[in-house]
Regions:
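Catalytic phosphate/metal-binding cores of nucleic-acid and nucleotide-processing enzymes, i.e., regions
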Residues: 1-115
Length: 115
């Protein structure tokens, strides 16, 4: 796939993912700006997460996670997360176990303070 068609496919995936997240109540989710590739997450508006969006048949999860980690460290905008989808499959998420535990404990503590 050529550079431009790969970019177009990636952009469509970002818009699709943002729409999916919006439909699930994450109303602030938006696809990143096409002109700012590498300067902002692929999908923004989810506090505490740096989202790298991928729409590929051939999985390169470690490579994608390394990219998300490097970008999250550079942008200082949240935990690195890869959300990807293959054709006719559901969206999947990659998050380190330590980040999952930290986020889950934060959610639990937040729920306890609401009671």
């Amino acid at each position: 796939m050529s550079g431009r068609s790969a970019q177009t496919k990636g952009r469509r995936a970002e818009i699709e993912l943002a729409g999916y997240l919006q439909s699930k109540g994450y109303t602030e989710a938006k696809a990143g700006t096409a002109l700012n590739y590498g300067k902002e997450p692929d999908v923004k508006g989810i506090d505490g997460l740096h989202i790298e969006c991928k729409r590929h048949e051939k999985l390169q999860i470690n490579k994608w996670y390394e990219q998300s980690t490097a970008d999250a460290e550079r942008m200082k905008d949240g935990k690195p997360v890869v959300i990807y989808r293959q054709n006719r499959k559901q969206w999947m998420i990659v998050l380190s176990l330590s980040d999952f535990i930290e986020l889950q404990r934060g959610a639990e503590n937040g729920n306890k303070s609401d009671q």
